[in-house]
UniProtKB/Swiss-Prot annotation:
Keywords: Disulfide bond, Protease inhibitor, Secreted, Serine protease inhibitor, Signal. This is Kunitz-type serine protease inhibitor blackelin-3. Expressed by the venom gland. It comes from the Eukaryota.
């Protein structure tokens, strides 16, 4: 690769680092999991972080055995995953 190509690559990597929000680097990996209602049949309102939309969304939670990306309140979801 030529020195010009290396400089371009270095510039792009630097730009990526600057534009990537600090919070996404520190966000727990479980925040990337999909909404998981679990196997139970309850109808509870819960929240999960949607990494594509970059926000917390409502979903119906069955009441048991969901993944860690399940929160009782939108505030808790935002504090942990969307900060």
């Amino acid at each position: 690769m030529s020195s010009g190509g290396l400089l371009l690559l270095l510039g792009l990597l630097t730009l990526w680092e600057v534009l990537t929000p600090v919070s996404s680097k520190d966000r727990p990996k479980f925040c990337e999991l999909p909404a998981d209602p679990g196997p139970c049949n309850g109808l509870f309102q819960a929240f999960y972080y949607n990494p594509v939309q970059r926000k917390c969304l409502k979903f119906r939670y069955g009441g048991c055995k969901a993944n860690p990306n399940t929160f009782k309140t939108i505030e808790e979801c935002k504090r942990i995953c969307a900060a």
